[in-house]
Amino acid sequence: MNGAYRGALSRLLSKPFFLPLLSGLLLGISFPTWPAVHLEPLAWIALVPLLLSLEHEERFGPFFRKSWMSMLLFCLIALWWVCLATFVGGILTVFVQSLFSVVPLVVFYYFKKRAGFRSALLALPFIWTGWEWAYMQQDFSLGWLTFGNSQANLLWMVQYADVTGVWGVSFWLLTFNVLVLLLFMEKESFQVKVGIVMVMLVMIATPLLYARQVFRNTALDNTSPKVRVALVQPDIDPHEKWDGLGPEETLSRLYSLTGQSVRGERLELIIWPETAIPFYIRLPENKPYMDSVRRMVMRWNTPLLTGFPDEVPVFPNSARGEAVAASGAEYAAYNASMLLHPAGGPVQIYRKMRLVPFGERVPYSEYFPWLERLSFSMSGISSWAKGREATVMHFTSRDGQPVRMANIICYESIFPGQVSTFVRRGAQFLTLVTNDGWYGTSYGPWQHAAIDRLRCIENRRAMARCANTGVTLFYDICGRSYAETPWWQQSVLTADVPLESRITFYTAHPDLVPHVCLGIAGVLALVAAVRKR
């Protein structure tokens, strides 16, 4: 029996795509899914089978096919749920993301050919981490599958992100994978094996010790001022919201839920989710609805932050998103949020700056308008224009103190550099509005919520996360959830949010780690170019 088992295993291992697909499987399931599933440690070894299969692959064609098959399976497992919102768009997302994920492995192939496999392994963490950052600087980036995001729910292992950001977590994981492979490959020196094991143990212990100190300091420091915030989860089907409900019924639901939340509470901020108001409420013909919202804010005597589609006039032939005809003028449409004060005054508006590729906007369509034909509309939502300013909103607390906050709209929380910009501009806490109802009961919304933890840790800012159908919750500065609503239920969640003013090392230097990695990778590439193998 044992012989038959070993024979079957040997035949399986001899299949050219078994090890690459095994890596793709391990990578895919290591990313956050539902709350009860914790397979994050698999990411610490997930790349080993793929790299092992590439050791003796000298021709680029087979090398690329193995790498791409691995990344394709990885992306399919981690991102299949995107197809629930738009099937064709989801397939395109998985395909494009897998191609971009292969890029660091193509560079690894160059190093391998010039400097040998072991030298290329040592360069891989620098190559991969630098590429992850570079990839996120352009509009095609989904940014979801940054390697470090796999550890988002493993809070004891990622607290050092306040120093390195998620980039440091990626580098840490990649280095550990390389060490595991080097340990497997070492056949001669017992001392070398012991040395590698010792380094691996240090790499496990260091984040744990750092986290222990962070949690201890957080428990001791309970002096931060707080604001009382209510999160309204209306639980409206997103397709129904855009295609079925009228303005009166939509606002009526929101008013009813919000009215319940203000009874007996000294609230200082009310938050409605992304596009909670699903029509162009600032257009002149919708002024009665805008006046209605203002009256309710005055009645509640509490500032209101809400998502809504905004529109501004644009000049002919200017770069813009979808044009909306109104009173003979031309408008650019934005996915936006606004803050209204009970005392009246100007509305504070933030317009979403990072848009979902192909779902909300076709990348670079402002330069090539014909690309608009490639958009995949979700109930008519597509072709938003890009916001240009990271606006920090402000209001006054009950005790008269000024409060500054960031508002992140949905997918933007995937971009660490953008969130840190809000904090450098003075945001004392983070708010996030989202509508993850497009993805049903898949683990997509939970994956999104998990990644949001990292933004809290990196900047040491609490987050009030308001979702249309869930996941609605509050995170503290360590990424721990301390209040949460049931999923797919109408509800209101109220809690105190701590305000912070300190700036972490990461917030002050958000691009330091990837820049260093790119610099070292560049130097190693020059060395490899002139080195004889």
UniProtKB/Swiss-Prot annotation:
UniProt key word Transmembrane = yes
Any Gene Ontology CC annotation: plasma membrane
Q: Can you give the residue ranges of the CN hydrolase domain?
A: 232-499
One Gene Ontology BP term is: lipoprotein biosynthetic process
Q: Name one Pfam family in it.
A: CN_hydrolase
Q: Where is the active site?
A: 274, 352, 410
List, in alphabetical order, the Gene Ontology terms for molecular function in this entry. Answer: N-acyltransferase activity
Q: Which domain of life is it from?
A: Bacteria
Q: Which UniProt keywords apply?
A: Acyltransferase, Cell inner membrane, Cell membrane, Membrane, Transferase, Transmembrane, Transmembrane helix
Q: How does it sit in the bilayer?
A: Multi-pass membrane protein
Read off the InterPro entries from this record.
Apolipo_AcylTrfase (IPR004563), C-N_Hydrolase (IPR003010), C-N_Hydrolase_sf (IPR036526), LNT_N (IPR045378)
EC category: transferase
Question: Is DNA-binding one of the keywords?
Answer: no
The free-text function statement in the UniProt record for this protein reads: Catalyzes the phospholipid dependent N-acylation of the N-terminal cysteine of apolipoprotein, the last step in lipoprotein maturation.
Q: What is this protein called?
A: Apolipoprotein N-acyltransferase
Q: Which gene encodes it?
A: lnt
